[in-house]
């Protein structure tokens, strides 16, 4: 992965600066290497992780078992209600427990769909954290087939908030509110509504309100109504929604400022990106939540702010490239139908372009 040099230890690279991995164009190997390093690092005291869907021969589980055997505290929340993976997850849970991991089996009434990993280190300088927040599962197989984003940070603030999230999960609860992370079911939908309101106010000030959203599905009525309100207030909204979409774009006086495309290509589009504002004002998030009522109110989901300038620019580039796609994109019409874009002289296949960019970055880094 160009974001992380696999030839060097991974932990110091994340301590130096935030990292973003884009699957399947970049490999999951650096993340697996990170887990293995954490399992063997004498400074690491604990590894905490939420598991939803795992590969059949999971290197993630191997690393967690190794960590427990090395005397680390390993806390794992395994979601037994993951559809089609219930049996697998029971087996993995037993294996982890036998190795000495502390396993929690989901939360009553909620499905834990968040992708969160927290590594806690204790050195002479004090406690430090490495937190990973993703849009997709810790699964080596699907990381080669689905497009997903994995954000890695050594931010103490994010690490402390992730600690709060795990503390609540361990007690069968969910956090009410933390400052930076958006955590469903209590502080994701309301934060998104606040961000949309922020863009409505920006439009009223003449600052050009803007929202960019990439998700799998859009069914949350409360968020849909707020997007319609934003469109009517003059906020321009770009959306990349692969699957179910209960909002019609381009309806005069209602959603004429909303533009929706669906991208269906070689890889399954699975990443979630939320952008609020433009230029210096823009705020970026990546996370596990679609804008569906089941995600915002009936699941534990987590989205994280991405604040490093280089990573914000990268997310904007990813989003812009998708909007420009004219090979895999279908554009939603006001009647709810979709019309396939036809590539002219300048064909843009966003997935092929991301693959090429990752390849070139890899070649460049291997020459260093």
Region locations from a protein language model:
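Cofactor-pocket helix-loop regions in the catalytic cores of large enzyme subunits
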Residues: 216
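N-terminal localization/anchoring segments of enzymes in phospholipid and broader phosphate metabolism
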Residues: 1-211, 229-233, 245-368
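NTP/phosphate- and nucleic-acid-binding module
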Residues: 220
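Hydrophobic alpha/beta core scaffold segments
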Residues: 236-240
């Amino acid at each position: 992965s160009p974001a992380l040099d696999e030839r060097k230890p991974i932990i110091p690279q994340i301590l130096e600066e935030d990292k973003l991995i884009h699957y399947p164009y970049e490999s999951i190997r650096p993340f697996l290497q990170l887990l293995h390093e954490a399992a063997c690092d004498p400074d690491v005291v604990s590894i905490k992780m939420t598991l939803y869907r795992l590969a059949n021969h999971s290197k993630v589980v191997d690393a967690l078992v190794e960590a427990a055997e090395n005397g680390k505290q390993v806390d794992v929340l395994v979601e037994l209600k993951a559809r089609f993976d219930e049996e697998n997850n029971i087996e993995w849970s037993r294996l982890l427990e036998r190795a000495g991991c502390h396993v929690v089996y989901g939360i009553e009434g909620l499905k834990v769909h968040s992708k969160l990993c927290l590594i806690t280190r204790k050195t002479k300088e004090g406690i430090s954290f490495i937190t990973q927040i993703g849009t997709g599962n810790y699964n080596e197989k699907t990381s080669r087939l689905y497009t997903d984003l994995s954000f890695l940070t050594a931010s103490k603030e994010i690490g402390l908030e992730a600690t709060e999230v795990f503390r609540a999960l361990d007690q069968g609860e969910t956090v009410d509110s933390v400052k930076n992370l958006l955590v469903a079911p209590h502080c994701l939908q309301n934060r998104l509504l606040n961000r949309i309101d922020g863009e409505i106010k920006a439009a009223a000030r003449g600052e050009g309100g803007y929202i960019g959203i990439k998700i799998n599905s859009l069914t949350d009525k409360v968020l849909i109504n707020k997007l319609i309100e934003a469109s009517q207030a003059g906020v321009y909204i770009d959306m990349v929604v692969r699957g179910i979409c209960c909002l019609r774009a381009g309806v005069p006086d209602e959603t004429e400022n909303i533009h929706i495309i669906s991208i269906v290509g070689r890889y399954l589009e699975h990443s979630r990106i939320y952008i609020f504002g433009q230029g210096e004002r823009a705020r970026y998030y990546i996370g596990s939540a679609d804008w569906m009522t089941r995600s915002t109110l009936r699941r534990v989901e987590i989205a994280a702010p991405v604040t490093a300038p280089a990573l914000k620019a990268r997310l904007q580039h990813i989003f812009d490239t998708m909007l420009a796609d004219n090979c895999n994109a279908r554009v939603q019409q006001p009647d709810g139908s979709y019309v396939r874009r036809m590539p002219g002289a300048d064909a843009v296949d966003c997935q092929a372009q991301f693959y090429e960019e990752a390849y070139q970055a890899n070649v460049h880094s291997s020459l260093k």
